[in-house]
Design a protein with these regions (language model features):
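C-terminal low-complexity, Ser/Thr- and acidic/Pro-rich disordered "stalk" regions positioned immediately N-terminal
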Residues: 555-668
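C-terminal membrane-anchoring or membrane-association module
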Residues: 679-699
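Noncatalytic carbohydrate-binding groove/subsite architecture in carbohydrate-active enzymes
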Residues: 188-195, 200, 234-397, 402
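Sec-dependent signal peptide cleavage junction
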Residues: 22-36, 666, 688-692
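Carbohydrate-binding surface patches
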Residues: 458-499, 536-547
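Glycan-recognition and catalytic regions of carbohydrate-active enzymes
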Residues: 395, 402, 406-476, 512, ...
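C-terminal beta-strand-rich structural cap/linker in extracellular carbohydrate-active enzymes
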Residues: 522-552
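N-terminal substrate-binding region of glycoside hydrolase catalytic domains
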Residues: 38, 44-191, 217-233
Length: 699
């Protein structure tokens, strides 16, 4: 029965893939000859500094330690590597599994001389040293939960060589040693944490901030097949997680525990074990719910919280119109899809172009779904993406996607996130981080409070806005033009008790990953202005006030919790009514509401589908008393015609390569291509079904 079910799932996946091929090929036949996304024109930007969304965690600007940290201003760093599940902290040996021909070695500490390679915890000490060198405030370490660690560094391990593996135990019944016994063939996790506390201090005293409960445990069976490990079940993962978390808390109660660190939507849904998931799918909508609920129950039983952060890995599975994997391809089609792929995290109107996303569409957009699960099953648990990547680190599309996702993480209340870079050149991704963390080279950064910002529904642009918790007038705004070839004029309207008269401008785009200072915005009148954006460019606007009216913002002391506010102002209701503007509320539909998070809601909407070419819709003035949903900061999809407005800020134009307009293709050619593709898909479906029938008969 298991094989039949597994075969049926394979057939279903193949059919979804075939349908995706057909849909993309027929629906976007012109993509074979030109762009699949069209440039859009003017965009209306509405910002309201008095509508605070949440506190932005400083830890979202993190990175994995697999790249140089010298030229990027990050706030968190973590260990990365597929071999971490088998890392032996006592000797620094690790086995690289099927990805590395099952070689056990000291590769993780290869930068050190041989006489110190066996120093206990050297790999982690190296992480702490780098964090200190580059002034990175938060460090996170991965613990081992698989049950086996490399027992030597002598090369390829063959099946049956049990002596070459050390047993991993979570708790040591004897005293925890300052220096471990490397000859007992056992590696203790509580002793590992104790060793790190002795050398670096408790988390509350500046030591290691948190510990991951292994890394991508759903892949143990495949990655370490020679160990003959059974497929991981949901119950087994929770059991091990609770035991290891208890060990961590017993040694360092102030350290955070993060898990389950599984990767991809399929893992979120069923832990990549559909057969086991049948036992729970009637009770829980996806594995995330099961994990949170059972970790909560384990915490209640133990009298202490055992999971502080719901941690996940996310690597885009999106494919271009030509079915190229976006994460590892930098063609024109992959680049334009990459700049849209971030929307799978928050936008219910977007479907990632992948078989997995289509199969599990009901579990997207991802962040609102995860937050709803947290509220339902384990309230006050934080959310992190300790490994993520949208690719394109060596070109502007990757820089735009990176700038976009950082804005999303801040706006959506993510606690911690670490870019997991791929390739030697990730200069554009690093620049995107630096734009938020040090845009002027003098330490100036995006604010720590997210405020309302909306772009009227334009999928070819994004906007994010912030103020400081101790300075409500310190408005910073990120604007992004995703148009491949066209300039875009942003018509910006700011609703605020502050009057802004100018804005400094910083940007990167085109073929350059350097942040440059542009001409300042000087044409702000009544908190409104027009701003011209070059194609494929990201901007940071630092606003300066003309007159700051008395205002005090009171926030919670916990910088990681959702913000609660009380605004005191001596501005008259008449003045406030004149300054406020209409805003759209798009995200109220995409994110489940919590009664503790919202008291007011607005369902105002603006449709841009009927906008005529060359026409700009005026912003409607409303009274200050208009209710606005706190969660309505989504950047939703729409399209407007291309418009270029003169008199806007002059910025040096950076034209990307391959921007010529595609030649029109005769309809007859398109029809022929459609027919050919349809024929191929039909053959694919026939082959899959035939294979299934034959296999069934053989059974």
């Amino acid at each position: 029965m298991y094989m039949k079910r597994k075969k049926a799932v394979s057939v279903l996946t193949a059919l979804v893939t075939a349908f995706t091929v057909f849909q993309n090929s027929v629906g976007n036949v012109s993509a074979m000859f030109g762009s699949t996304l069209h440039d859009t024109g003017n965009v209306e930007i509405t910002i309201n500094t008095d509508k605070e969304i949440n506190r932005i965690s400083s830890y979202i600007y993190g990175i994995n330690d697999s790249c140089s940290l010298a030229d990027v201003e990050v706030t968190a760093v973590k260990q990365k590597g597929n071999s971490l599940s088998s890392y032996n902290w006592e000797t620094n040996a690790a086995n690289f599994g099927a990805d590395g021909d099952y070689i056990s070695s000291n590769e993780l500490v290869s930068a050190f001389s041989k006489n110190v390679m066996n120093t206990p915890g050297l790999y982690t000490k190296n992480l702490l040293d780098k964090a200190k060198l580059y002034d990175i405030p938060a460090q996170y370490v991965t613990l081992q939960m698989m049950g086996y660690a490399a027992n030597d560094a002598l090369g390829v391990v063959n099946p049956g060589e049990d002596r070459r593996w050390a047993e991993v135990r979570f708790n040591k019944t004897d005293d925890l040693l300052i220096y471990p016994d490397i000859n007992d063939d056992i590696v203790y996790m509580d002793e590992y944490v104790s060793y790190l506390v002795n050398s670096a201090g408790f988390a509350s005293d500046g030591g290691i901030n948190g510990y991951f409960l292994d890394s991508e445990p759903e892949s143990w069976t495949e990655r370490y097949a020679i160990l003959d490990i059974d497929s991981l079940t949901a119950a087994e993962l929770v059991s091990r997680s609770a035991q290891l978390a208890k060990s961590v808390k017993s040694v360092d109660p102030s350290a955070m525990v993060l898990g389950p660190s599984v990767s991809g939507i399929e893992s979120y849904v069923n832990l990549k074990n559909e057969d086991d998931w049948r036992n729970y799918k009637e009770t829980y909508s996806w594995f995330i719910d099961y994990y949170l609920d059972n970790m909560r129950m384990a915490s209640d039983k133990n009298g202490k919280r055992l999971l502080d952060v719901l941690d996940l890995h996310f690597f885009t599975e999106a494919k271009s119109a030509l079915l190229e994997p976006v994460i590892s391809t930098d063609t024109k089609f992959a680049n334009e899809e990459r700049m849209q792929a971030v929307r799978v995290l928050w936008d219910s109107n977007y479907t990632e172009n992948s078989a997995t996303a289509r199969l599990y569409k009901q579990h997207t957009p991802i962040i609102p779904m995860l937050q709803a699960s947290i509220r339902m099953y384990y309230p006050d648990t934080k959310l992190s993406f300790s490994e993520y990547n949208f690719g394109g680190g060596n070109n502007i599309s990757g820089g735009i996607a990176q700038a976009d996702v950082l804005g999303v993480f801040g706006r959506e209340g993510v606690y911690m996130a670490c870019l997991s870079p791929d390739g030697d050149d990730i200069s554009f991704q690093k620049t995107a981080i630096n734009l938020y963390r040090d845009y002027d080279g003098d330490g100036s950064s995006f604010g720590d409070v997210s405020v309302y910002a909306d772009n009227g529904g334009d999928v070819m642009s994004s906007v994010y806005a912030s103020v400081e918790s101790d300075d409500a007038s310190a408005l910073r705004t990120v604007l992004i033009n995703k148009n491949m070839t066209s300039k875009k004029t942003a018509l910006v309207s700011i609703s605020s008790h502050n009057v802004y008269h100018s804005a400094k401008v910083y940007s990167f785009g085109g073929n350059s990953s350097d942040i440059v200072s542009e001409s300042a915005v000087e044409n702000i009148e009544n908190n409104s202005f027009e701003f011209e954006m070059q194609p494929l460019t990201v901007y940071m606007l630092e606003f300066e006030t003309e007159e700051i009216m008395q205002e005090e913002t009171v926030v919670t002391e916990n910088t990681d919790e959702i913000l609660t506010e009380e605004t005191v102002s001596d501005v008259s209701e008449e003045t406030a009514a004149e300054e406020s503007v209409t805003i759209t509320s798009a995200e109220s539909e995409k994110m489940p509401e919590s009664s503790s998070e919202k008291e007011e809601e607005s369902s105002q909407s603006v449709s841009s589908d009927s906008a005529e070419e060359g026409k700009v819709t005026e912003v409607t003035v409303v009274s200050e008393g208009t209710d606005v949903s706190e969660s309505s900061t989504a950047v939703i999809s729409s399209q407007e015609s291309d418009i270029e407005t003169e008199g806007s800020v002059s910025v040096s134009e950076k034209e990307p390569d391959d921007t010529d307009e595609p030649a029109k293709v005769p309809m007859a050619v398109k029809v022929i291509v459609c027919m050919l593709v349809a024929a191929v898909v039909i053959v694919m479906i026939y082959v899959v079904i035939t294979d299934f029938i034959l296999a069934h008969k053989k059974k």
